Amino acid sequence: ACGSKQQQEDGDDVNKKDAVRYLCNWSQGYTRRSLAQVWADRSGETIDWFTDVLAESGIDFRHEIDEKQEGDNYEVLDVGHSTQYGDEYSEQLTMDAVLKHAEADGLEVQYEITMVKLEKDGNRVTGLIAKNANDEYVRYNASKGVILACGGYSGNETMMNALQPQSVEQTCINYSKPGAKGDGIKACLWAGAIMDQTHTSMIFDRGAIKPDQVGEYGKANDGALFWMGSQPFLKVNLNGERFMNEYMPYDLVLHAAASQPYHTYCTVWDSKYPEDVERFATHGCSRLYPHVNGTAPVFPIEYIEGMNADLQDQGYIVQADTVEELADKLGLPKDTFTATVERYNELAAKGEDKDYGKEDYRLSTLSEAPFYGVRQSGGYLICTMDGIQIDDNMHALDHDFKAIPGLYVIGDMSGNYFSGSYPCLM
């Protein structure tokens, strides 16, 4: 958000012009600039409202302040706010809190309702037809209009293959919400609305595959969630060669890997990884230590240590006493991998990445056994980010780029925001 009460109290508010510029640049100009301005102007009060609603249920929602160091390769804007779950991580907690608040205001909720089609009188949307849990058709009449928040289409294999084959290939695990089938988007298209011209997904580089597996061309992988995957440890291709600056926004790592054999790579680290991770000072949900202002991360390092132990038990993460043994267990050419590690250790010792330009404090050595590694191919698919094009009042737009009366679109199924990549550093 921009302009929340917490940001202002922390003296860490974000310049709205910078935020809008950032969004538009990240989408290669596909963002509707005036819509981004609406977000910049209204997001602060929205976050304030959400903070108060969660507080009614005893849930803390806090602003995140992160380090900004000279020489950083990527600009970071402290727009993030996150739920402080404590020991009980469950998205259901926040959903229950919002539902409780809404029902107190008179909201009626009906469950297991599937979108079928919109109904129109002339050009105006007047209601919709849906199916209930008994597979019965239900008509909803709407005198003021219909607001659709049906989610994206990341759970619709046909739509994903048709619109985002590159995202399918870069998916290791699909964490789509159950309703993300594209029903709302299709209903809008049938009613005369238009969709974004470019199609993209939110995919984080946190997928693990077994040491004897590789990514498949044109197909999604079947792996496990490896949350530490976004940490900028040394990453090598199947030839044992370093091929990237490992500190890049989540999906950019997957884009870089797309030009490597079987779009598969290995992430490797040693026994001192907790102190390395703290020094790396990553941002957003990849962060594993408290933020500068004390806001807790989504998952603390202690939780990740347990997750890694489980992945090791399941045969995803391998452990070795020597670098040569690590190469064997990951199926890498021993001589090439050993030379790569020696070179990387040399760069880290000198504090300058002359090969790929990574920040000095995000370099680390592989020097203290035991050593660990994991194969990665594709990531953690959360949702699609393209959708129905909307105006600044959230009206769906028709083929003449005019608002369709009575039809509003919000959430993951709305468009004109993103293209190509998710701006995870905002």
Question: Model-found features: residue ranges?
Answer:
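N-terminal glycine-rich dinucleotide-binding loop that anchors FAD/FMN and/or NAD(P) in oxidoreductases
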Residues: 1-21, 337
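Rossmann-like flavin
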Residues: 13-75, 318, 322-333
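Conserved redox-cofactor binding core of oxidoreductases
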Residues: 38-137, 157-158, 208-210, 348-368
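Short acidic, glycine/proline-rich loop/turn micro-motifs
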Residues: 80-82, 158-162, 418-424
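Short Gly/Pro-enriched turn/cap motifs at secondary-structure boundaries
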Residues: 80-85, 175, 219-227, 257-258, ...
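A glycine-rich dinucleotide-binding beta-alpha-beta segment and adjacent secondary-structure elements
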Residues: 117, 322-325, 336-421
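Glycine-rich loop(s) and the adjacent beta-strand/alpha-helix scaffold that form part
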Residues: 133-136, 140-211
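An anion/pyrophosphate-binding glycine-rich loop and adjacent beta-alpha core
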Residues: 185-187, 191-329
